[in-house]
Design a protein with these regions (language model features):
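Short beta->alpha transition motifs characteristic of CBS
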Residues: 32, 44-61, 126-127, 140-158
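Bateman/CBS regulatory modules and CBS-like beta-alpha motifs in cytosolic regions of diverse proteins
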Residues: 1-26, 32, 38-45, 70-123, ...
């Protein structure tokens, strides 16, 4: 099985000029955690999602924790008002201003083998990966794949059928 067997095509996308507020609204309305950002030709530019949005709303002091745990944030005097202020600062800015530029964004291709896909999803900090067709310097977005797609692929592909032979099903318990 490869990524093309389980990926979601025809995904919702953002333009680089779309605002953070628009992105948040679309994520909420469509119940998705990540939205790929593409140019006018459908070429992949980056990914904007809830993880990035959460990072933008954190107090600056929280970003300087380094190796310390986020559970140590109780000392910050931040209130919802300050978070609202940070939201108003970024809401009307384009998502292109906040795409991850420092790290290499992980992606897969339609032909990525299932074991490699599992490893990429495990390595990724996001809950989904863009599926890209790479031709030279261009990266054409053709879909997205998530942990839920993998789960559905395992169940629908009966990959676990043999592993459960002779075991009672959940329906029989």
């Amino acid at each position: 099985m490869t990524t093309k067997n389980i990926m979601t095509s025809g995904v919702y996308t953002l333009k680089p000029t779309d605002t953070v507020a628009h992105a948040m609204s679309l994520m909420h309305k469509k119940h998705v955690r990540n939205l790929p950002v593409v140019d006018s030709k459908g070429m992949f530019i980056g990914l904007f999602g809830l993880r990035r949005l959460s990072h933008l709303l954190l107090p600056i002091a929280a970003l300087d924790l380094g190796e310390h745990s986020l559970s140590e944030l109780h000392f910050l005097p931040d209130e919802i008002v300050q978070m609202g202020d940070r939201w108003h600062e970024i809401a009307n800015q384009p998502v292109s201003d906040f795409l991850e530029k420092k790290k290499k964004l992980l992606f897969c291709t339609p032909d990525t083998a299932f074991p490699e896909l599992l490893a990429l999803l495990d390595e990724s900090k996001d809950s989904s990966l863009p599926v890209i067709v790479v031709e030279g310097d261009t990266k054409q977005l053709v879909g997205m794949v998530s942990g839920w797609d993998v789960l559905e692929g395992i169940i629908m592909g009966n990959l676990i059928k043999g592993a459960n032979a002779g075991q009672p099903s959940a329906d029989n318990e």
